[in-house]
Amino acid sequence: MQIRFLGQSAFLLTSGVHQLLIDPFIAGNPKSPVTLEEALGWKVDAVLISHAHGDHWGNALDFGRAGVPVIGTAEIGGYAQKNGAQNAIGMNIGGTYRAPWGSVTLTPAWHSSSFPDGTYGGMPTGLIIEMDGVRVYHAGDTNLFSDMRLIGDRGLDVALLPIGDHYTMGPEEAARTLELLRPRVAIPMHYGTFPVLTGDPQVFAREGRARGVDVRVLAPGETAEV
């Protein structure tokens, strides 16, 4: 699997002929390495949304109106459908959606969720994605919580974790989650996009590697092979 970091919490996952786009904050993202026009040209199987805040919901409707399935909570699915997405799939925490590309399971996250227009976005979530035998946990926006151990019990290959502080956990707390999640590889996200997100990825890398985890710090546009 190739995991391409697109800035903030956006990632493009590629495995064989399949591609998934997570939290597609592209237009308006000062760290995005691609334009929205470029991204809309990708052959994406689905767009996965952790929660409804603008820096995660992002350009979901642009993809949804172009026919790409938009997957998230029931509230996110309903909002997407109401606003022109051709194939919106609403789920809830604990549920799994299966497709030819693999599966996604929604997990809890400790945060909040509302759309840019103020509409309630349901519960914030994390995402466990399985593609071709690789299991990736995208934590969304969250703090450390003890039930991360249960997520780790599923056997994670990769954890994508917010480290920016202020709205989520900072780098030291994010490193502590690795003791519960126990992934092979960890990649930091949700930092440096705006001045308030001061978490240092090198602190996370140092603390994570001290716990025996392969931490990979990606610049926007860079790709990790896992």
UniProtKB/Swiss-Prot annotation:
SMART domains: Lactamase_B (SM00849). The keyword Hydrolase applies. The keyword Hydrolase applies. GO terms for molecular function: hydrolase activity. InterPro entries: Metallo-B-lactamas, RibonucZ/Hydroxyglut_hydro, UPF0173, UPF0173_UPF0282_UlaG_hydrolase. Keywords: Hydrolase. Belongs to the UPF0173 family. This is UPF0173 metal-dependent hydrolase Dgeo_0136. It comes from Deinococcus geothermalis (strain DSM 11300 / CIP 105573 / AG-3a).
